[in-house]
Amino acid sequence: AAQELGWIFLILTGISVVYGAFSACVQTDLKYINAYSSVSHCGLVLFAILMMNQTACTGAVLQMLSHGLMTALFFALIGMIYGRTHTRDVRELSGLMKIMPFLAVCYVIAGLANLGLSGFIAEMTIFTGSFQHPDTFHRVWTVIACSSIVITAVYILRLVGKILYGTCTNKHHLTLSDATWDERTAVIILIACVAALGMAPWWISGMIGDSVLPITDLFTI
């Protein structure tokens, strides 16, 4: 049934990947942006599983790990920013790099890590495995899903530029405090985990590959 009806779910997941990324581009609430980004990233997990091969499924597990860490980091930073500014509206935030440099730098790291460390590695593993599928239909949808990488770069870079740089337009934000030591410790731990997964993925991808192999072998029976 998975092989016969998988193409239906492939279309649905491919749409969710691209639609989620586009939806994140037009949101003005920081939490909504992160939520729609999660729709896109979680869609990639099911997209990879539907390819039914070891490489793609390894990428799916990496994506779940990466997404869990990245989402926790983003929501933690958003919560810390909201706790100080009392707003999540992108249009009301600007110039935070000068006001709360630690939180701002961590937000930049989180955004770039989503594009270039653990997030990128997981997605590339998924797309590499997807292109290994012998069916042209699956490869076409892989190309469509690949566009989400570019869209993700657009909304993350635009968001970073909007809320962190420029001139602060709200005078009440000028006196806000930066992160406390408790907050810094929590954020640094998450960043360290993201960096470890992104810069040395081989230490866990091998274990994941061995674990998913018996499952993917069932698809070929």
Name the predicted role of every residue range:
Residues 1-162:
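Hydrophobic transmembrane alpha-helices and their helix-loop junctions in integral membrane proteins
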